[in-house]
């Protein structure tokens, strides 16, 4: 058994999650949400909840940029459920830092209240810190059936999410 089978935080980041983090860090919160939602839908393991939590923080920040106090409060409240039980670092993502940053943002949003939300200083929306080289591989194998990332073992691959077996000729291969 590999260490990422024992601990899902040790596995590589889904490629669409990486796209989502890059978009999040560029302040493109709607697009980040879309990419992270793709990763969340493709992922069948427990780490999908981490992607869900991050995408909800992206939506929270989107609401803040649009001056939508109620939307920010509501979506941030939902994100707490998905963000609370993760290791401080998971799949190279500084989860603890993101939680702290989001809590700081929401304290300020709450302080401003619905009447003054448009006064929120957008420079308080910090990027997600993550190790872009974490478990980076030269080739990423993606299951044609469920879209999950797989790992080669002598050109025989089993999808960790749906259990389908493939040989290398059956796979979509993406190069970094």
Positions of predicted regions on the chain:
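Residues immediately within or flanking Cys/His clusters that coordinate Zn2+
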Residues: 140, 156, 165
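Short cysteine-rich clusters marking metal-coordination/redox-active sites
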Residues: 143-146, 159-162
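Short Cys/His-rich "knuckle" micro-motifs
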Residues: 153-156, 169-172
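Residue-level recognition of tetratricopeptide repeat
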Residues: 21, 59-61
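TPR/TPR-like (Sel1-like) alpha-helical repeat modules
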Residues: 69-87
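Cys/His-rich microdomains that often coordinate metals
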Residues: 150, 166
